Structure formats: structure tokens, C-alpha cells
Amino acid sequence: MAFASLIERQRIRLLLALLFGACGTLAFSPYDVWPAAIISLMGLQALTFNRRPLQSAAIGFCWGFGLFGSGINWVYVSIATFGGMPGPVNIFLVVLLAAYLSLYTGLFAGVLSRLWPKTTWLRVAIAAPALWQVTEFLRGWVLTGFPWLQFGYSQIDGPLKGLAPIMGVEAINFLLMMVSGLLALALVKRNWRPLVVAVVLFALPFPLRYIQWFTPQPEKTIQVSMVQGDIPQSLKWDEGQLLNTLKIYYNATAPLMGKSSLIIWPESAITDLEINQQPFLKALDGELRDKGSSLVTGIVDARLNKQNRYDTYNTIITLGKGAPYSYESADRYNKNHLVPFGEFVPLESILRPLAPFFDLPMSSFSRGPYIQPPLSANGIELTAAICYEIILGEQVRDNFRPDTDYLLTISNDAWFGKSIGPWQHFQMARMRALELARPLLRSTNNGITAVIGPQGEIQAMIPQFTREVLTTNVTPTTGLTPYARTGNWPLWVLTALFGFAAVLMSLRQRRK
């Protein structure tokens, strides 16, 4: 009785919500304790039972603050190291970001308790998953979006991974919310029926992991080399270090020419404008073509627009075997989804003068097109994404083509030091390979550089914070997964059906 009385106190529930939210961080890399996702979501649902809408919204907010406060604390590393502001201000900015993201979980909990106040199957198994899908969409879309820490990613090595090639990671989010709600209902009501249904729903997708949605093409196996330069972020954009940086990458690449069909340098490996490096690029292109290798590299490009101003792009270009390199070549990729404050500054004229954090090097990029043709290097077709873009499953899928041989992502996670951020980023990249059934080549400045197999498995990787080259044979695949064909449309149809049913049944219950 004492415990039952204690748990009814709103302050206790708020504290528990904070703890259950923080527990959710353990579901993601580098911890990879996937059951923590279920425990965390169970806590969110159970704590909002028998609460008024505003109380539930507060619980949802605290739960989100626990999740994001612990799960994205790596943002502090970047702000504290490169922001040039006092410590308390750095902490405040991280708290502000976590609080903003928590508004969406608060919205979920508040609306759920407002429209479906009773602790029923309808609430936990039908309404909650549909509403969660909507609020998670909003979190990934409003103000350019920040869809980090979606619990579906926790299943990259878990029992539900087989659902990803069929309906994508968001379908796993949907199912996790449903299963967690049923488990919470079984626990609170002490009823075995929701428990049985939850176990069945959780077990049903397990055999799907054994379906192979792709066909390997061993005759097209190539040797790939990815150069991890490990250039400190504090030196990366120092003009005095440019020549040394080029030497590091060239010296690591020269022995690979003629041996590796494809050589990859990371995001902005060449820390200068492409137009300024024409002699270097053309000489390197000629050497690569003479030896039958191709190079893909990140670089910065600036182009004069119709308003007679320069648009600066975070770009990938190709050199080597095939058509000679040209500054006018269309075989390039310009990053579309830019990171606020890192690659562009909202309200630029107001914020830039305020602090160094708002005036970081290379923080005035322009957007490339949303849909871009694949890169072609040495006859290899690559669907590309730069850094943050790889977490955007629908965008990667929209750029994916049936003839894509590999997914390619280049990144620079040096901003986030030895935090958990790069591991979370890596986990999300693995999900893209699983969803689209293609090997993924991930080249980074200081880790995590790796080759991911078409089932999301790690085939090869090198340690973080080392200056090394990852060289391995990679076999391309062919074939289209159901998710590659349809994207998130089936899930949105399911969400609409669940939402309609939940509203209709709720109205009927109120009329009785």
C-alpha cells in the first residue's frame, strides 16, 4: 500500500520518468542493450496511466529530457571545445536542445491522455503507436528536424531487425511502442492477456531476419580502401595545415593505386575550395587513371549563382579511371540536408556576431538538390550521403536506384571527440544498409570507418582516432527490398488506419 500511495504522487512519477528516459540511452550504441528500449517505453506509457493531460504532458517532457539529456550530451563536447563561450553557457545550450526535443514527447503523452484517458487496450495498442509515429515525424521535420535516438535503431542487432527491409526503421519504432504499451498494461492491470499478445507481436518478425532480399554479385567484387586521416578538428581548417593534410592523404593513397579499384577520402578531406586545387586534382586524376583506380573525396565547392553571389557546397567529387576529371563534371554530389549552426546559421545576421559558436569555419553552406544522380567511379554506382544525411532514411531511399552497387557515406565526427555521438551515428548508418540491402562504405576523418554488409552487419572496421587505411574486398548486391520499393507509405497507411480506429472507438466509448 505504501508503494501504491507513493507511485500516485506526481513528483515521484516525474522523477521516475526522468530515470526511464535516461535508461533508453542504453539501447543505442555503444551500449547496445536493446531491451532498454522496451523498458524505457514501458515506463513512459505506465507513468501516464490515470493522469490528467497536463500531468501526462509533464511526465512525457521529463521522460524526453532524461532520454535526450543523457543521449545527446555529446553535443556539449562540440560546443565546449569549439564554441568559444563560458562553461555555463555551453551547458545551457545543451539543456535547451534537450528541452526542445522533449516538447515532442510531452506532446505525445499529453494528447494521448487527453483523447484516450482510460487505461485500455485501445490506448496502448492502437492509439499510442499511431500518435507516436506522428510526433516522431514532427521531431524529424520541424525546423529541419532532428530524428536522433529513434528506438528502432536499437534493433539493428535485435529480434526485430528483419522488419527494417520491409517497412523501415520507423515501423520498428511503431511496433516497439505497441509492445511496450501492452507490457505496461499487463503489469499495471495484472492481466496475462496483454502479455501474451505482446510476446506474440514481438516474436512474429523474428523469422524475417532470415529472408535474403538481395543477390550477391561475386563477379563484381572489388578491393576498396578508405583513408582515415585523423586530422584534429582544431587544425582541420587552418590554412597553414592544408599542404600537410594533402600530403597525409596522398602518401596513404599512392601505394593503393593500381591495387584498390576504389579509394575513398572522408568529408572535406581537401580543406580548400575545389577551384583553388585544380592543379593538384588534375595531377592526382591523371595518376589514378594511369594506374586504373578511382578516388572519391570530400571537398568544398563554391559556384557563382544567378545573383552574382557565391554558393558554397559540401561536396563529393570523383577522380581517376573513366572520363578525365573536370571542374565542370556533373559526377558530383552536393549535400542537401545541412546541420543548423554547423553548416548554416538561422537568423545569420543576428546570431553570428553574438559568439564564436555561431561563426564556426565553413558554417555558411548552400543546399544541393534533394534528389541527385548516383556517383559513378570506375564503373561503380554509388548512392551518396554526407555525414548527418545518412540518418535520414527516407531521403537516402529516395536517392537510391535499382542499379546502385553500394551506399556511400563520408563524415567527420571529430567535432564530438571521444563521446557516444559517433557510435550512435554509426548505428544509424548500419540501418540504411539493412533497409536497402546494399553494402555501405563509411569513410570518416577519425572514425568510425567501416564496411557494413547488406544485412547491417559489420564486415570490416578500423579503430577510432588512428591514422590508418581500411582495405578490404567488398561484394556488391542487387535486388530491391520492399522498403526500397515503397518507402514509408505502408506505415503511414497503417498509422492512418490505427488513428482513425482509435478516434472512432473512443467516440463510441464516450457515447455509452
From Swiss-Prot:
Phenotype upon gene inactivation? Essential. Depletion induces juxtapositioning of inner and outer membranes and alters the architecture of the cell envelope. It causes mislocalization of outer membrane lipoproteins. The mutant has a copper-sensitive, temperature sensitive phenotype.
> Where would you find the membrane-spanning parts of this chain?
10-27, 34-48, 53-68, 87-116, 121-141, 169-189, 192-210, 488-508
Q: How does it sit in the membrane?
A: Multi-pass membrane protein
According to its UniProt record, this protein's enzyme class is transferase
Q: What is the effect of changing residue 145 to A?
A: Loss of activity
- Please provide, in alphabetical order, the Gene Ontology terms of the cellular component aspect for this entry: outer membrane-bounded periplasmic space; plasma membrane
Domain CN hydrolase as annotated: residue spans: 227-476
Pfam families in the record: CN_hydrolase, LNT_N
User: Where in this chain does the entry annotate a coiled-coil region?
Assistant: none
Tell me the route in metabolism or biology where this protein functions.
Protein modification; lipoprotein biosynthesis (N-acyl transfer)
User: Where do the catalytic residues lie?
Assistant: 267, 335, 387
Q: Which GO terms describe its molecular function?
A: N-acyltransferase activity
- Gene3D superfamilies cross-referenced by the UniProt entry: Carbon-nitrogen hydrolase (3.60.110.10)
Top-rank taxon, per record: Bacteria
* Reported effect, residue 352 to A: Loss of activity
Q: Of which family is this protein a member?
A: Belongs to the CN hydrolase family. Apolipoprotein N-acyltransferase subfamily.
Please give the function described in this protein's UniProt entry: Catalyzes the phospholipid dependent N-acylation of the N-terminal cysteine of apolipoprotein, the last step in lipoprotein maturation. Utilizes a two-step reaction via a ping-pong mechanism. Lnt undergoes covalent modification in the presence of phospholipids, resulting in a thioester acyl-enzyme intermediate. It then transfers the acyl chain to the amine group of the N-terminal diacylglyceryl-modified cysteine of apolipoprotein, leading to the formation of mature triacylated lipoprotein.
Q: What is this protein called?
A: Apolipoprotein N-acyltransferase
Q: Which organism is it from?
A: Escherichia coli (strain K12)
Q: Which gene encodes it?
A: lnt
